[in-house]
Amino acid sequence: MNLLHLDSSILGDHSASRQLTHEVVQAYQRSHADSQVTYRDLASEALGHFSAASLAAAGTPVEARDASQQQEVDTNEATLQQFLAAEVLVIGAPMYNFTIPSQLKAWFDRIMVAGRTFRYSEAGPEGLCGGKKVIIVSTSGGLHVGQPTGAGHEELLKALFAFIGITDLQFVRAHGLAYGEEPRANAMTAAQQHIESELFAA
């Protein structure tokens, strides 16, 4: 099984989501000894924001592209191919200002490609990436699940993946991390217990 591990937190070694995605991947490897893991750090190796230049590069014939346009096309295609090759994705998705990190959104902008990961028909949009499994490590300083303030975080992630045909999503949550040392420790412990005892249980 090919597993794609994505981190998007800007907090480096201080990141709760990075710690937990690492533990998820370790747990997955223990139960899937033949798994092949590809790691990508979307914060330290950030993709540029999707822009008019991105669209222009894609729409320019190969022979007419300048070096920067070709680099943009190559980066976008490599990102898409990396996603398409993955059967399982483990994604660290902290909440920043009620939504996902902009670095993670830039990644979505590279994989949501008409004709490749979804298509339009007379019946409407159709996702083309069914069969993949996604495990999302969701972290936040407050408690937002089920609240209007959470709509741009987990609900957004569900909508983005559903649009391209992926509905097998599992969440590992560590929320309320800014509420003090004890609530943070309790949230992290609960997430770790979920990873160890439930996430990959037969």
UniProtKB/Swiss-Prot annotation:
Question: Per its database record, what is this protein's job?
Answer: Quinone reductase that provides resistance to thiol-specific stress caused by electrophilic quinones.
Q: Give the enzyme class.
A: oxidoreductase
InterPro entries (alphabetical): Flavodoxin_fold, Flavoprotein-like_sf, FMN-dep_NADH:Q_OxRdtase_AzoR1, NADH:quinone_OxRdtase_FMN_depd
Free-text comment on the cofactor: Binds 1 FMN per subunit.
Q: What is this protein identified as? A: FMN-dependent NADH:quinone oxidoreductase
Question: HAMAP family from the xrefs?
Answer: Azoreductase_type1
Is Transferase given among the entry's keywords? no
Names of the cofactor(s) = FMN
Any one GO MF annotation of this record: FMN binding
Q: Which UniProt keywords apply?
A: Flavoprotein, FMN, NAD, Oxidoreductase
Subunit record text: Homodimer.
**Catalytic activity entry:** 2 a quinone + NADH + H(+) = 2 a 1,4-benzosemiquinone + NAD(+); N,N-dimethyl-1,4-phenylenediamine + anthranilate + 2 NAD(+) = 2-(4-dimethylaminophenyl)diazenylbenzoate + 2 NADH + 2 H(+)
Gene name for this UniProt entry:
azoR
EC number(s) on file: 1.6.5.-, 1.7.1.17
Family affiliation: Belongs to the azoreductase type 1 family.
Specify which residues bind FMN according to the UniProt entry for this protein: S9, S15, A16, S17, M95, Y96, N97, F98, T139, S140, G141, G142
